[in-house]
Amino acid sequence: MITTVQEISKWRNLCFIRMQSRKWYPVLKKTPLVADGRKIIKHADKVPHPEEIIHPFYQPTAIEQFTACATEYNPSLLDGKKIAPSLIKHPVSLKTILVDSKLKFDDIRGVNRWLMEFVARRQHQRNIVLTPASKSVRSFHVLHLSSTDIAKLRGLENILSEIENTNDLQSRVESVNNELQNIFDRDSKQTRLFCEDILAYLIKNYGNSTEKLILLINVTEMQLFSRLDQMKAMNIILYHILCKVEANENPPYSPTLVTALENLLAAINNRFFPGRCENSLHPIVIEQLLSYFIKTGNLNESKNFLGHLIKKGILPEATIINRYLEAIDVHFDKSTKIFDIRSKFAFIADLAPIIENYGTIDLFKFLIPMCRHFDELCSLLNIIRKSNNAKQAVDSTLPIFIKKVLTFTKDPMINSGNLSTVFNIVSPIYGQNVPSEFVEKFILSFALQGNYTMMAHMIDTYKIKLSHKYQLQIIRALKNSERNHALKNTGAVGYNKEFKKYFIEKYLNCTEREALRP
């Protein structure tokens, strides 16, 4: 563990903290702490505990694990780059903070056990079974009001029918509340009326305008501390409120309505729980709240309710997940900045079981741009390869994968190797008969690396027809390669002048050849 709070105080003025490893984890050296402009001390680099890493899909391959366990000095994953999103304790404030960590150890001691814990955690996420929530709404039906009961509500109906705006809302709330009290006072000895049944009836039949719905939400909040004394009752009322919100308004919702509903939720928490009420809400109501918060752009609450559904073993609807991902992209403006990617990982950390077992094409497309290392990309591609809709998913995402491969490094030989790895992963999905449209994209990507050997190999193996238009695309790619890699790998096998000459003479027409002549 890290040093005690007393020791931290002792050494803070000297601007460093002596970090000690957990149990068997590799010992870490003294690391200087640098204060930024906001006087927040930068956390010392250290390997986080596997449970602190929130990456939802990275899984080191057997080769990565073997390499890490066989490297005596500074073994690492993800090349030791600071790209593993983690929730760790700040060494001074002890608050949980979101950081990008390095998976780089000082030496080989404890690496194997660390990997075992990390892989076991990923396996646990993989084994989580989620099922869609039951769509039965029978428990939310208002069944308890007879025609005689409804006749007793005439005074409430009259008050609601007179509401046209929110200017006198508070006085109307008091009027409704007083009338409710009168109803219960008149029938105190023989009534079978319950407050939740009355409110649910009124919301269902009179909550067709924003003003009336806000009034009924405020009345519900007032009744929380008198007649609404069970969460079962609140489930019924919340269900009907959220149905009306969905039916009445398109986002953006009225700020007054948003405030009223969120005040009601806060009051429910205060009334029944010291913290949050999710554990006692019906899954359908949780899905409704999740959908509502996504539409209002409240990502923090959306994440809370989404995570709660998953922890309860419930698979949210694909449309809700897609809207959640869209809301994240809107919030971060599809940014690929380091800080924004790290924050995005925090919002999708709970999706690990869904990514592993229930991933959709839209979800995979969202995740590809978030990869900052080729090994992450391979982990995601392997998940897709094992999914039930592997072929359809690869058909839709392979061009994005190919493009993404070339963003991790400018080294043409590494890029060529990575392209070959991706090709070898997806080939079995097509029974080795990869569609020519994808093979052509690989060829153009190899052309951008100046790899004449792989271009020739793929053209021959898959019998690609080189139309005039396609030859021009190859030539443009090769010219870009010569500009970008003019001083690199010119003598390497597959990249040198002899291979270039061979490729030009065998695969390009006479008119196209001249464009590549020195």
UniProtKB/Swiss-Prot annotation:
The gene is AEP1. Belongs to the AEP1 family. Required for translation of the mitochondrial OLI1 transcript encoding subunit 9 of mitochondrial ATP synthase. This is ATPase expression protein 1, mitochondrial. InterPro entries: Aep1 (IPR031467). Coiled coil: none annotated. It comes from Saccharomyces cerevisiae (strain JAY291) (Baker's yeast). GO terms for molecular function: translation regulator activity. The keyword Transmembrane does not apply.
